[in-house]
Design a protein with these regions (language model features):
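Terminal accessory carbohydrate-recognition/targeting modules of carbohydrate-active enzymes
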Residues: 1-152
């Protein structure tokens, strides 16, 4: 798959985010749609019990259904892992009045076995020698930042 083959787009007048058909966020533009890209990659995954990392956008046992809520720019990607009978509903949208990208994940255990599910994010911001980036963990969240922007 080419990196910039966009299957879904969400945004407002200042912010634009594009996604693959498997829910992978490919691009994020701000403060206008033609501005620079901020993400090198943004991958999410889970660990179920003692399993290896299951990347939500790329696992052989995952099936995908993607749709917009009716008459909105709210994008839903339903990811079902058939091995663990785990359904993940990923909801992505950009608020209309504020330039905020919201990513929400709901986990539904459809198996008869109790599962210990850990949610993981593996991401990297685009940078160069003059624009160093860093990150830090705060409570149950993560912030990545440079001198002129941050992603939390």
């Amino acid at each position: 798959m080419e990196k910039y083959l966009n299957d879904a787009i969400i945004g407002n007048k200042n912010m634009l985010a594009t996604f693959s058909s498997k829910g992978e966020m490919l691009r994020l533009s701000y403060p206008n749609h033609d501005n620079r890209q901020y993400l090198k990659y943004f991958h999410t995954g889970v660990k179920v019990n003692d399993s290896n990392i299951i990347y939500l956008h790329d696992d052989i046992n995952n099936t995908y259904i993607q749709y917009y809520d009716t008459d909105t720019n709210i994008l839903n990607t339903e990811i079902t892992n058939t091995y663990f009978n785990l359904k993940i509903v990923q909801t992505d949208f950009v608020t209309i009045k504020e330039d905020i990208l919201v990513k929400k994940y709901s986990f539904i255990n459809d198996s008869n076995i109790e599962q210990d599910i850990k949610f993981l994010i593996h991401s990297e911001l685009l940078s160069d020698q003059n624009n160093f980036i860093s990150g830090m963990k705060l409570d149950n969240g993560m912030v990545q930042f440079a001198h002129d922007f941050s992603i939390a």
